[in-house]
Amino acid sequence: MEHESLINGVLKNPNVMGLCLYDATHLPDDVLADARRTHPMLWQGGSACPSSDYAPEDVLARCNQPLDTNPGAVTYTVRGSADLRPARSFAADYAGWVGLSRDGLDDLQMIATELATNSLQYAGGSCRLAFWRHNEHLVCEARDRGRLKDRFIGHRRPSARGTASRGLFLVNAMADLVRTHTSANGTTIQAYLRLNPARDC
């Protein structure tokens, strides 16, 4: 549902329309209720009509739940720009150990750099990077003390003239999955990269 809510906020183009299919006969009522909250238009009786329950911000707020960190994760704290290069090397060493592909390793280093740089620039403090394996993915997590006020940052294409949100946009483009939690106590972003299936660790 979070993905559905974000799409409508990102693709605000009257010339673009998509049709999402839901089996109203068999799906639970709560799933159908969320579908009405995350879709501005509903197809009923052969025609489209506005959804009176449309409330994507409410759904995003409900999906904004704390994310668990693996207690066995390896960590690296970035306190300034001088720590970025060592952080990339740290990420590369762990990626090689768990079997991430060469292309995936390059993506991981870029993701770790962009997440840490974003924390340094906008959170006003250090960034704690953590890495661990989750099933067939490598997770790169960034935690800081800042608060992400715009949930669409990183999903909208950044302005050609500006640099704000460009890093998070790249993270979302390179990772297989990005999860975010933000509150007054700080922000956590987790980026998932698929491991090389040819190697079993």
Predicted regions located by residue number:
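Non-catalytic regulatory/interaction regions at protein termini and inter-domain linkers
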Residues: 1-73, 85, 101-103
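Aromatic/hydrophobic pocket-lining residues that form π-stacking "cages" and hydrophobic walls in ligand
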Residues: 7, 91, 115, 142
